[in-house]
């Protein structure tokens, strides 16, 4: 009876304009822009586009980080983002030899670069994307920010190297095998973590924008779903994953992806050789010491963009506004209630009520397995329309599929002259309504209340309902036999289901 379900709930994104403002305020992008504006003819870079060591102090000073012991590292990180996002263009050192100006020699270039020789340093110019910072559309800003996110993601999955010289071979190349680093595995791990954090954020009943404890996030990547009490070995893996994530979220926070409260360093010292393993029971204050993280609105946008690029179906509230009623009703079929209403309200805002009502009613027809839920959502959408929709609703009073919901709408809106429904329409609507709720996979107790309310309202319900010409009659009666809390009524439902199937 159920149609294909979306793998992820819909996300409510901020507008592009709001997200663009958030992107421009991200600390790392702010630093990258500042360095791009600072860079000039005397700026020298290495073969990989990195600032030469001698220029890092000046770059740190531009960022106001001259007195910070990590200032040069922050400057180097911001410069990489400036290069990778096109805020600056790097000109390869080899290109310098093509200059026609005899005074534009490698030696003069190297004077500013310190230990680098002229033949080893390149130059930079302002990149085309620098102008987008002040003159670009929101979509341009977000594209630039996504490029920065890619750079930071790569940094977060890169191995920590304490002594790079020890990894450089005699031929000058880095021995990556000695790092014991699996780049694909590292990227897959972080993708999985961000995916789980995204799901926790958008799921109904999730943290509703609140922070997620780092132990819970680490456990979601390590502890098997069918495991009861985690073993010591698994807890050790959770501890290792927490430490790994602590480093990665510290790297991801400056680009504006997450808000992160790091693991308490004092806790790491307290734990000593055992690692920062959370105890079995701890209060709310204890949990925060193990790290707390949440995706920002910009982070939701960024993670969703990566998922879309990977080919996943990642719905967002509002993306159905320009589509037809059939796409709307199919699209929101398994949305959480609040998201379905928000999507519907947005869809209705762009249409006159009479036209919207006609389109919704036309899309609600059908005998396919998803039709009952489409009709339920059509009825809920119609309930948001005023009296302007009445002519369209009255036009389907005699329709065997829509006549019942039309009468419900008219009654709810206090209309006069509502014709009494034929008895078969009453039972057909009951079957259709239960079929829709079964497909929706809603709260079981609410469904039981609905079933018992419908059966109690009509005398001889099971003596009549099995004759209803509805594709889901037998399935609905079988479900009623399972769910009805009154045993005699449940038995009647099962008998009626047998009759419906025997009738063919």
Question: What would you call each of these model-derived segments?
Answer:
Residues 346-348, 411-454, 460-461:
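Alpha-helical adaptor scaffolds
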Residues 1-110, 114-155, 159-234:
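Short, amphipathic alpha-helical interface elements at domain boundaries
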Residues 69-84, 237-264:
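Short amphipathic alpha-helical interaction segments
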Residues 321-326, 335-342, 357-358, 368-377, ...:
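Generic helix N-cap/helix-start motif at coil->alpha-helix transitions
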């Amino acid at each position: 009876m159920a149609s294909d379900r979306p793998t992820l709930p819909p996300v409510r994104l901020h507008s592009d304009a709001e997200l663009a403002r958030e992107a421009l305020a991200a600390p790392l992008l702010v630093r990258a822009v500042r360095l791009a504006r600072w860079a000039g003819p005397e700026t020298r870079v290495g073969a990989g586009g990195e600032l030469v060591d001698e220029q890092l102090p000046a770059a740190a000073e531009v960022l106001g980080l001259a007195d910070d012991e990590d200032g040069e590292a922050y400057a180097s990180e911001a410069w990489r983002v400036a290069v990778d996002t096109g805020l600056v263009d790097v000109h390869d050192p080899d290109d310098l030899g093509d200059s026609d100006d005899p005074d534009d020699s490698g030696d003069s270039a190297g004077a500013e670069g310190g230990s680098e020789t002229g033949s080893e340093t390149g130059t930079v110019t302002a990149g085309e994307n620098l102008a987008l910072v002040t003159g670009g559309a929101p979509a341009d800003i977000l594209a630039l920010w996504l490029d920065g996110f890619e750079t930071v993601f790569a940094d977060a999955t890169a191995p920590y190297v304490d002594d790079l010289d020890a990894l450089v071979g005699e031929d000058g190349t880095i021995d990556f095998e000695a790092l014991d680093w699996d780049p694909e595995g590292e990227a897959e791990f972080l993708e999985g973590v961000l995916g789980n954090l995204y799901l926790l954020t958008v799921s109904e009943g999730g943290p509703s924008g609140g922070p997620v404890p780092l132990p819970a996030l680490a456990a979601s990547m390590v502890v098997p779903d069918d495991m009861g009490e985690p073993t010591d070995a698994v807890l050790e893996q959770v501890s290792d994953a927490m430490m790994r994530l602590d480093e990665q979220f510290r790297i991801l926070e400056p680009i504006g992806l997450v808000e992160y409260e790091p693991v308490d360093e004092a806790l790491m010292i307290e734990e000593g050789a055992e690692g920062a393993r959370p105890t079995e029971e701890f209060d709310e204050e204890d949990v925060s010491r193990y790290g707390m993280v949440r995706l920002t609105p910009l982070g939701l946008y960024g993670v969703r963009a990566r998922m879309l690029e990977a080919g996943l179906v990642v719905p967002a509230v509002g993306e159905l506004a320009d589509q037809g009623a059939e796409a709307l009703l199919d699209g929101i079929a398994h949305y959480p209630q609040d998201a379905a209403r928000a999507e519907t309200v947005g869809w209705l805002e762009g249409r006159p009520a009479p036209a919207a009502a006609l389109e919704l009613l036309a899309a609600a027809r059908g005998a396919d397995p998803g039709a009952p839920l489409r009709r339920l959502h059509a009825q809920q959408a119609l309930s948001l329309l005023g009296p302007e929709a009445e002519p369209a609703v009255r036009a389907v009073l005699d329709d065997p599929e829509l006549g019942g919901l039309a009468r419900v709408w008219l009654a709810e809106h206090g209309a006069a002259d509502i014709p009494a429904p034929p008895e078969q329409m009453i039972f057909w609507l009951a079957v259709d309504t239960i079929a829709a709720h079964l497909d929706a996979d809603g709260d079981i107790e609410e469904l039981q209340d609905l079933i018992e309310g419908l059966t109690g309202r009509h005398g001889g319900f099971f003596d009549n309902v099995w004759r209803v010409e509805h594709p889901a009659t037998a399935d609905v009666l079988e479900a009623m036999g399972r769910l009805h809390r009154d045993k005699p009524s449940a038995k009647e439902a099962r008998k009626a289901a047998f009759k419906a199937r025997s009738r063919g």
